[in-house]
Amino acid sequence: MIKSSIKILIIEDNPGDARLIQEMLKEVKDIDFEIIHVLRLDEALKYNLTNNFDVILLDLCLPDSEGIDTFNIMNYNAPDIPIIVLTGLEDEIFAVSAVGKGAQEYLIKGEVDCKSLLKSIRRSINHKVIGNLD
């Protein structure tokens, strides 16, 4: 069951992309989103990830990490938190690889809207909860 409050960590080096995601989530009226945005992977790793976030939105191309290594590092440090990969079209191969390694989903920047973002977040959290019951 989806919570009425969801805490999200956005790891995105482009402030415009991060702001767009936050604006999309503000359109959702029945869920209170608590959003933390960081620009770099090393900033994200400073948080107590396991206890503090319901989902992570992860850009694969960051100033301090790039490609599938970005996902691998985050997944290693937050194995119990669902990760949704955000990617530009040119990074789609990395995104598909990340899903194969455990990312819940990937979203292509520029193609995502409020409805698809919310659906991905809900599905990722529910999938992780069901997976933890096994």
What are these regions (language model features)?
Residues K3, P15-L39:
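Two-component/phosphorelay signaling modules centered on CheY-like receiver
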Residues R40, E66-D69:
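Acidic catalytic/metal-coordinating carboxylates
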